[in-house]
Amino acid sequence: MPCPASARVKEMAENTFIVRIKRQQRPDEAVRWEEYELRHRPHLNIITCLRDIAEKPYTRDGRESTPVSYEANCLEEVCGACAMVINGQPRQACSALVDSLEKPIRLEPLTKFPLVRDLVVDRTHMFESLKRTKCWIPIDGTYDLGPGPRMAPAKQEMAYPLSRCITCGNCLEICPKVNQHTQFVGAAIISQVRLFNMHPTGEMHAAERLEALMGPGGIEDCDNAQNCVKVCPKGIPLTESIAAVNGQVIVHAIKSWFFGEGQRPGAGEVPE
């Protein structure tokens, strides 16, 4: 007869899994890997795993550690904060279900952004790129301006998928052109330029956005690897946006060459 104690040990082993986490207290400190053995439950995601570790921060070999630093907010794949590298692929931790992941599970911070601590990175580069390309709708004052210009239904259908960007940084993480040697803004920012150039009010500043993308780190740095569209959690047609904005940049450059700065007819117009 099988020993009841060994049966319990086997059952416990089958109901647990291993999570390996790359940890670093500060950017200037040494990297260390820690393993945690966690109890399996149905519908478990990576954020819940990190919360379990925070409640009992003991490694697999029994050493007391500290809660893992990470970012999360909405837990609905909307805020973009919980992006990290899971089993070698950048994705959102809130939608990464344990049952669908290869074991042991490996968690690492995004590598294309400066490290803050553990799984937390500084995504200032993305927000500075959005400012550089003026990805917003300018308004005069805070008073009621009344109803704005209408957008054609066909444009609305094109614009809505672009508006779902959550600035997670996955597309920059997977892009071979985003590295310490380049200033490439990345697919997300190019797609946002397309979105705001499409807006009836935003298109008045289209020329400024296109000028920004003609500079260092702009659209010319894209090598069309097409990795970005594969990891976007919102399914945004990033490669279509890159192609569309590339066409806008070419038209803008030709107008600039023929008519000179500030003298281009239809400077705010962009091709459909």
What are these regions (language model features)?
Residues 39, 86-88:
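Short strand-turn-strand beta-turns centered on an Asx-Gly dipeptide
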Residues 1-12:
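Short, Lys/Arg-enriched N-terminal segments with co-localized hydrophobic residues
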Residues 94-96:
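Charged interaction scaffolds used for protein-protein
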Residues 72-76:
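Serine/threonine-rich, repeat-prone extracellular segments and beta-strand-based repeat modules
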Residues 32-45:
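Short, contiguous acidic and Ser/Thr-rich linear segments
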Residues 13-19:
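Short structural boundary motif marking the start of a folded domain
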Residues 44-66, 105-272:
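Ferredoxin-type iron-sulfur electron-transfer modules in oxidoreductases and energy-metabolism complexes
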